[in-house]
């Protein structure tokens, strides 16, 4: 579980940290860098928002997982900044599963081209690791629609990361094997779907990372 702490003060994060939570997610680069400088160094920081290429450099030295990678251009910039920091950065490719223009992400054909075409050049990006997929369901109370969107992403996930998702801290020996078209060497591929309003459906449909904000922190403060 990633505790979505955007707009929340460091004191609120410290409270959850004291209860054992270590994974926290932020949507804005400036807010993330400010909190990272103030809070314990063993926190695993996840970037959840739409990341602009020119801001990757500010988080490249410490970010644990970037959830919303939605272009090859962004992947290349993350790789460049990761090389500068002499590390490998885990990334999730965001897939556009909702029928809403406000959502970012690859469509299914774009994703296939990226992961299977040699022309995409993923093999040359040595300082990123595609660890799985991420998606956001439509903003609706229609649970059947949400379930259908999650189910569709699970099907896409299985195509490139074979076998059922397992918890990200599972042992490597029991992890599903990935096809050569996926460049990840992570022991447990990640399917990141589900937020406070739909996490139960997401887990039923195979999510192994949910992003929970309001259920943990209460209503979101205005940025």
Regions found by a protein language model. Name each.
Residues 208-209:
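Divalent-metal-activated hydrolytic enzyme cores
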């Amino acid at each position: 579980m990633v505790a979505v702490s955007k707009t929340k003060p460091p004191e609120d994060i410290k409270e959850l940290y004291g209860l054992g939570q270590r994974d926290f997610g932020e949507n804005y680069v400036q807010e993330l860098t400010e909190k990272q400088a103030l809070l314990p160094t063993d926190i695993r920081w996840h970037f959840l928002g739409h990341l602009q290429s020119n801001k990757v450099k500010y988080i490249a030295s410490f970010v644990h997982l970037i959830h919303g990678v939605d272009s090859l251009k962004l992947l290349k910039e993350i790789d460049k900044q990761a090389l500068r920091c002499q590390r490998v950065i885990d990334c999730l490719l965001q897939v556009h599963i909702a029928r809403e223009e406000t959502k970012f992400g690859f469509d299914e054909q774009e994703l296939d081209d990226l992961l299977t075409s040699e022309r995409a050049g993923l093999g040359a990006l040595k300082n990123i690791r595609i660890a799985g997929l991420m998606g956001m369901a439509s903003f609706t109370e229609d649970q059947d629609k949400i379930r259908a969107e999650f189910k569709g992403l699970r099907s896409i996930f299985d195509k490139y990361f074979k076998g059922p998702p397992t918890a990200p801290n599972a042992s490597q020996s029991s992890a599903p094997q990935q096809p050569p078209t996926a460049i990840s060497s992570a022991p447990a591929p990640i399917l990141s779907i589900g937020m406070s309003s739909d996490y139960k459906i997401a887990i039923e449909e195979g999510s192994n990372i949910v992003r929970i904000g309001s259920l943990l922190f209460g209503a979101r403060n205005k940025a």
